[in-house]
Amino acid sequence: VIISRNQYGAAMRYQDEVLYQLLTTTRENALLTGTPTDWLFLSDHGQETGDFINRAGHSTQTPSGFRIPLLFWSSDDAPHMAANRPFRADGLSPLLLSLAGIHWLRESPAENFASKDYRWRRPAISAHDPELPPSEK
């Protein structure tokens, strides 16, 4: 587990540097050109690194296994209200469609992470995560 954790840590430090460079370049370009820009990074899965159980790898039963990072930046002021909001990966489609200006039948602002009307829905998962907030009404 220690070797896996060290390898994973090194990979994450490298990824963080790449993401920093991409976001910095995106922000600088948006500011220079005045072009409305949205930048998003969403991991495809979590990774257990021995924090909750004595194993490393994919896990659907520990927070390290099902929590994933979301990085979101927009040159528009409106999406900044999304800071520190909980987000579920299955809510990515409404967010991306909204950012692209695409509307659809049965569109619900409550599902759009960047909307002022967004409402968090706690996922129905078998694993226990005491840090997940309850659903918003």
Where are the model-predicted features located?
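Catalytic domains that recognize anionic headgroups
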Residues: 1-137
